[in-house]
Amino acid sequence: MGRIAMGLLGAATIAMGAGATAQQTPPPGRITTPEGAVMNSASDLAYRPGQLTPEQLNSSTANLFTGPSANVFRRYPRDKTDAMVKFYTGALALKSLSPIQLTATQQMLLTGVGHGQIKLSAGQQGNRKYDMAGGVTGGTGIRYFRLTFPDKKTVLDRFATAGFAAPKFAKQGDGTEATLVTDPGGFPIEIVIKPGAKDGSNDGVGVGINSSNLEVSRKFYRTFVGLDERKPIKDKLLGLTLYPFGRGETTLYLYHAGKNAHPDNGSAGIQYVVSDSPLADAKAKARHIAVETPLNRLAGFNLITVWLNDPDGVTNYYAQLGPRPAPAQAASGN
């Protein structure tokens, strides 16, 4: 998917994230994002009971994915915007994509990582939990992003130029060095120096997810989302055993640590660009997966989305750009 299309998807994400500065309780039946942005119901696009076979409903969403990566988003306090931009595009040197002005006072910020994006959304309104106390092991949810770079000196120079303290790297015993820093909004970023890696983490992004029940979460990402489960790995820096699940350039790292004193399901989330959001919606309903935001259209962006939650409330957001293709047929074995 080209940068223009990805930009539109980013615009929709932040349009949702930048809803109303002062959130109000929506009227009954109105569809909103966690931040309160209003969307149009797309229930007319939903598959009817009996329209899909049990095999279609119980298969994963893997064959709906388009493009070589997923996207992630990061919500943060609005007053941290300038520092966040300096951190992600200066210290980390992620590619700055064209921002989109949503209103006179609200702007969408996009950074590129390979074919995907880290989307920066100012504002933490809504009914989501924002609690990164305890860092990587403090509670459930997305607790860190993992970015890779080829050269340590270049990273150190960029941090200094951007006005941030120099990170301290430690050897990992596998030819890499790593450090853990926090962005200006208090979210951990693991930086890995890996010989041969693309600069600006253009090999993609890693997403660390602390799970309350590792087996249940692994099943969700394996059998529903349909990510490629890989062999467990040890992260020496974090002191964790990680269970990787891949989607092209994007890797989710599941783990279980701590006593879940500080669950967080609002600071970050995952977006999958797909060919048929209503089909993802149907599969979710068949398995009683929690729906964060029902099937909807976002006016002005030609976007059909459904926001689902993993077992710990992590946002797994399915976004379809453009009209839905011909409905899946029972005979297709989708």
Show which residues each predicted segment covers.
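Sec/Tat signal peptide C-region and signal peptidase I cleavage site
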Residues: 18-22
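N-terminal secretory signal peptides that target proteins for export/translocation
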Residues: 1-2
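Amphipathic N-proximal alpha-helical interface segments
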Residues: 120-128, 190-194, 254-257, 319-321
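Bacterial N-terminal signal peptides
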Residues: 5-16
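Vicinal oxygen chelate
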Residues: 23-79, 108-112, 129-209, 232-236, 240-246, ...
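Core segments of cupin and vicinal oxygen chelate
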Residues: 28-29, 34-36, 53, 63-66, ...
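Short, charged/polar, Gly/Pro-enriched secondary-structure boundary elements
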Residues: 115-119, 186-189, 249-253, 262, ...
